[in-house]
């Protein structure tokens, strides 16, 4: 299963136990969706219960409601919260969704086939995979890219027809032509030209065009990988990825990169993270490790929503990166269990 000589995993090894059982693998992923939506729904309702309209939202240690406010839910002029009922509805919807996902996970764990190739549904058989079948792995990658592409496209549609909070004018507004500045996204933001650092994007038109561009790229990549198996040269170049350890290492690398990008973006950007909801931009400090601090005076032990989001993303990204390195080395054939033996032999020689 893995490129190391340790094909068996204990109960604590998570999805690795199901690397050869596509049905169980699917069940584990659906269960993760259930946990994520349960957390999102529960924390949204928890934050709503402790929300104080007399205190700035950014100074209350909230992390989910500020995102909903940025999307224009229940927000009036100047970033004032005029209706909290949408937050309640969204929290409940996520809890209901978590129950649906949980039921799906239980079905696939207890009733569904362990191997999707044995499913009674032809569509489900399309998602059975073998680690030496590059076409099947490419097909699954393609569907993941489609999901991300549709999400980016959905945000563009939301910008066009509902609108989000624009911190530059203090109002919720729509973007009437969300692809108008796509050339700027490609040739200015894409090359970090002066006044076009993507981390400091300062208008909704560019934000919309960036998401429209990413949506097109992701959807094109999704359709490509669904219909085109990886080329032989790609399989040779990325041979270590066609294994459970390799796939996990690549996923963790992407997650880590996204975490570092999100940490810095949330620390400095005031368009996607308005000051009204997240607090003012942060200041970078250095100690044993880099960290970001608030630039306003708060009661002892209190932090802005921006500080929580930024620092949690940064340190999670750091530890996820260590996981990437661990699994990447295992995918390349390195056996960590030999390290104590090697150290023991050195001490014996001494």
Curated annotation (Swiss-Prot):
Pfam families on file: PSII
Named cofactor requirement(s): chlorophyll a; chlorophyll b
Residue intervals passing through the bilayer: 26-46, 62-82, 87-107, 214-234, 248-268, 309-329
MF GO annotations: chlorophyll binding
Signal peptide: none
Entry's localization field: Cellular thylakoid membrane
Keywords, ordered alphabetically: Chlorophyll, Chromophore, Membrane, Photosynthesis, Photosystem I, Photosystem II, Thylakoid, Transmembrane, Transmembrane helix
One BP annotation, GO: photosynthetic electron transport chain
Cofactor note: Chlorophyll a.
GO cellular component, one term: plasma membrane-derived thylakoid membrane
Primary localisation category: membrane
Annotated InterPro entries: PS_antenna-like, PS_II_antenna-like_sf
Topology term for the membrane: Multi-pass membrane protein
Described purpose of this protein according to its UniProt entry: The antenna complex functions as a light receptor, it captures and delivers excitation energy to photosystems II and I. The Prochlorales pcb genes are not related to higher plant LHCs.
Protein family (similarity comment): Belongs to the PsbB/PsbC family. IsiA/Pcb subfamily.
NCBIfam families referenced in this protein's UniProt entry, alphabetically: PS_antenn_a_b
Quaternary context: The antenna complex consists of chlorophylls (a and b) and chlorophyll a/b binding proteins.
Protein name: Chlorophyll a/b light-harvesting protein PcbA
């Amino acid at each position: 299963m893995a490129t190391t000589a340790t094909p068996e995993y204990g109960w604590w090894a998570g999805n690795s136990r199901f690397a050869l059982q596509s049905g169980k693998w699917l069940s584990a992923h659906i269960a993760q969706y259930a946990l994520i939506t349960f957390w999102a729904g529960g924390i949204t309702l928890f934050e709503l219960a402790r929300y104080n309209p007399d205190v700035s939202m950014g100074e209350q240690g909230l992390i989910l409601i500020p995102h909903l406010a940025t999307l224009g839910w229940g927000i009036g002029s100047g970033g004032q919260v005029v209706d909290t009922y949408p937050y309640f509805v969204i929290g409940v919807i996520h809890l209901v969704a978590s129950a649906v996902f949980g039921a799906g996970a239980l079905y696939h764990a207890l009733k569904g086939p362990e191997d999707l190739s044995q499913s009674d549904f032809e569509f489900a058989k399309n998602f059975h995979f073998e680690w030496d079948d590059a076409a099947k792995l490419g097909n699954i990658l393609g569907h993941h890219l489609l999901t991300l592409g549709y999400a980016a496209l959905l945000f563009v549609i939301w910008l066009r027809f509902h609108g989000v909070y624009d911190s530059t004018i203090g109002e919720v507004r729509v973007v009437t032509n969300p692809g108008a500045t796509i050339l700027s996204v490609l040739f200015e933001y894409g090359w970090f030209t002066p006044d076009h650092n993507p981390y400091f994007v300062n208008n909704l038109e560019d934000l919309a065009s960036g998401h429209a561009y990413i949506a097109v790229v992701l959807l094109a990549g999704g359709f490509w990988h669904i219909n085109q198996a990886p080329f032989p040269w790609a399989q040779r170049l990325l041979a270590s990825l066609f294994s459970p350890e390799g796939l996990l290492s690549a996923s963790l690398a992407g997650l880590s990169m996204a975490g570092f990008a999100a940490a810095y973006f949330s620390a400095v950007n005031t368009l996607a993270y308005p000051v009204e909801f997240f607090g003012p931009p942060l200041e970078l400090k250095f100690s044993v490790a880099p960290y970001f601090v608030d630039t306003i005076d708060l009661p002892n032990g209190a932090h802005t929503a921006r500080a929580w989001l930024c620092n949690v993303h940064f340190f999670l990204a750091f530890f996820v990166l260590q996981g990437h390195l661990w699994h990447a080395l295992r995918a390349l054939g390195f056996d960590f269990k030999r390290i104590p033996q090697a150290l023991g032999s050195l001490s014996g020689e001494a």
